[in-house]
Amino acid sequence: MTRIHASAVVDSKAELASDVEVGPFSVIGPNVKIGSGTKVGSHTVIEGHTTIGKENTFAHFAAIGGPPQDMKYRGEPTQLIIGDRNTIREFTTIHTGTSQDLGITRIGNDNWIMAYVHIAHDCQVGNHTIFSSNAQIAGHVQVEDWAIMGGMSGVHQFVRIGQHAMLGGASALVQDIPPFVIAAGDKASPHGINVEGLKRRGFSSETVTALRQAYKVLYKDGLSFEDAKVEIQKMVAASSGDQATADKLAQFHDFIAASTRGIIR
């Protein structure tokens, strides 16, 4: 049975699974869908065309599904889609998309989003990410699986953050972070491979060593960007006997090759 506090305001058109909990003074809009097992704390607002999956937890005073902070926005029915088992803490803001992009802001599964985080319009967040308190990402940013955002970090619009990358606290990021790389600084720069994080995720020592070598080729060997891409592609081919390592090297190569904003240097 849905447990809705008497002081909460839930629009009659909202679709809530039978076991959803809504705390005191929260507001749920007419175009909201919330899946089984999700809990909404007190004083939280969920509005817009927002679809939320199963077993999510929203703490107090979160603002979810509000209109994008984009001066071109004219009220188009854009969306926010949130997956399963996410934890979204106090005073977090997550906005719907814009028609200038795909029209969808998307949050995957199993993400840990701490207090005062801002996820802007059209952002695409993968699975198992961590957003530390006060991390802020601008519109159209992509955050891939297992990435970690340090507290009080800020990310420029259209930037991509690769799988298993880590952005240090209070950093300002204006270009892409390749997968597996640590970045930090008031103009974020590379600080090596996220070795401890990869070990915790079960990466083999051979794969970690290969990724450190790819990092060296890209950042330490004095090669041009184009020449570094060629050398890393050779490393992919040379690792064909170890498919896991070859796959991770290919991810590293393909990410930097696809960059339009450029990568951190």
From Swiss-Prot:
The keyword Nuclease does not apply. It is an enzyme of class 2 (transferase). Its EC number is 2.3.1.129. One of its GO terms (cellular component) is cytoplasm. Keywords: Acyltransferase, Cytoplasm, Lipid A biosynthesis, Lipid biosynthesis, Lipid metabolism, Repeat, Transferase. It catalyses: a (3R)-hydroxyacyl-[ACP] + UDP-N-acetyl-alpha-D-glucosamine = a UDP-3-O-[(3R)-3-hydroxyacyl]-N-acetyl-alpha-D-glucosamine + holo-[ACP]. InterPro entries: Acetyltransf_C (IPR029098), Acetyltransf_C_sf (IPR037157), Hexapep (IPR001451), Lipid_A_LpxA (IPR010137), Trimer_LpxA-like_sf (IPR011004). Gene3D superfamilies: Hexapeptide repeat proteins, Udp N-acetylglucosamine O-acyltransferase, C-terminal domain. It is found in: Cytoplasm. The keyword Amino-acid biosynthesis does not apply. PANTHER family: ACYL-[ACYL-CARRIER-PROTEIN]--UDP-N-ACETYLGLUCOSAMINE O-ACYLTRANSFERASE, ACYL-[ACYL-CARRIER-PROTEIN]--UDP-N-ACETYLGLUCOSAMINE O-ACYLTRANSFERASE, MITOCHONDRIAL-RELATED. This is Acyl-[acyl-carrier-protein]--UDP-N-acetylglucosamine O-acyltransferase.
